[in-house]
Amino acid sequence: MFRPPSIKDAKKIWELIGRCKPLDINSPYCYALIGRDFFDSSIVYEEEGRIKGVVIGYLRPRAPERLFVWQVAIEAKSRGKGIAKRAIEAILKNLERKGHCIQAIEATYTPSNLASKALFHALGREWKVVWIEENFLEGALLSAQEAHEEEWLITLPFSSEALGVQGANHANL
């Protein structure tokens, strides 16, 4: 079952992300703020009362037509079932219901995070959109003490023709 995250989910989300290498783990406090402030653009996947997946996103303040997918974490035993894809689609539909006109999805990935790169490439192929990839952040900018990989930015711009819909209606996703 998909549902919005809440403040009470912070510790469980933190634990899940800690088990999903190579994701950077943030503080439980950060995940509490996600549940408080970004529940419209984020989602958790729950089975039998346990959080088995989370997609955390936000609308960019200076480009609110763009959904930035910040973290995708799916429990190891639940991977390969399309949960991440369905979660992103559920977020898009939720944002549309709330009156947002999303024109692109953005995300970053490190070269070692092949699953993340594969997810966004698969979405681009399925939605028949041409994605754009560019080197975004040098690793040295992200850590003063230990090595951090560079971050690549992938953008999936939508077009009504590519999605087969009028405007930003994501009903066919």
Swiss-Prot record:
Its EC number(s): 2.3.1.178
Gene Ontology molecular function: diaminobutyrate acetyltransferase activity
Any single Pfam family the record assigns to this protein: Acetyltransf_1
InterPro entries according to UniProt: Acyl_CoA_acyltransferase, Ectoine_EctA, GNAT_dom
GO BP field: ectoine biosynthetic process
Pathway(s) per entry: Amine and polyamine biosynthesis; ectoine biosynthesis; L-ectoine from L-aspartate 4-semialdehyde: step 2/3
Keyword Transferase attached: yes
Protein's recorded name: L-2,4-diaminobutyric acid acetyltransferase
Organism: Wolinella succinogenes (strain ATCC 29543 / DSM 1740 / CCUG 13145 / JCM 31913 / LMG 7466 / NCTC 11488 / FDC 602W) (Vibrio succinogenes)
High-level lineage: Bacteria, Pseudomonadati, Campylobacterota, Epsilonproteobacteria, Campylobacterales
